């Protein structure tokens, strides 16, 4: 996978898969972002990650968080990192063992 250093990262963590799917759908419809990952964290928590330009990621995460809240009590956290440091990138692409 090529490096995406300098491209914003948006994250939404949910309780359950349904709010995560709703958030992912809303994020990709709201702005020009790329859905890069879905992680099953454990205990029913799911994290969805998107990448794109900072403004687009900001709009996408807001839309995803709103959609997730409409599904019920699914939203745990929503966060944006405008320009992740290059040392963070390997953590995002680690393969599961």
From Swiss-Prot:
This protein's UniProt keywords: Bacterial microcompartment, Carbon dioxide fixation, Carboxysome
Gene (UniProt): csoS1B
Protein name per the record: Carboxysome shell protein CsoS1B
Domain comment, as recorded: The tight homohexamer forms a small pore which is positively charged.
Listed GO CC annotations: carboxysome
Organism: Hydrogenovibrio crunogenus (strain DSM 25203 / XCL-2)
Transmembrane regions listed in the UniProt entry: none
Quaternary context: Homohexamer with a small central pore.
Chain's role: One of shell proteins of the carboxysome, a polyhedral inclusion where RuBisCO (ribulose bisphosphate carboxylase, ccbL-ccbS) is sequestered. Assembles into hexamers which make sheets that form the facets of the polyhedral carboxysome. The shell probably limits the diffusion of CO(2) into and out of the carboxysome.
Family: Belongs to the bacterial microcompartments protein family. CsoS1 subfamily.
Entry keyword annotation includes Zinc: no
């Amino acid at each position: 996978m090529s490096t995406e250093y300098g491209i914003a990262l948006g994250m939404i963590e949910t309780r359950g898969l349904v709010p995560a799917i709703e958030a992912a759908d809303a994020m990709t419809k709201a702005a020009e972002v790329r859905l890069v990952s879905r992680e099953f964290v454990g205990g029913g928590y799911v994290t969805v990650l998107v990448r794109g330009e900072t403004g687009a990621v900001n709009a996408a995460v807001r839309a995803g968080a709103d959609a997730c809240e409409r599904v019920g009590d699914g939203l745990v956290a929503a966060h944006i990192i405008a320009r992740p440091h290059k040392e963070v990138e390997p953590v995002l692409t680690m393969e599961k063992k």
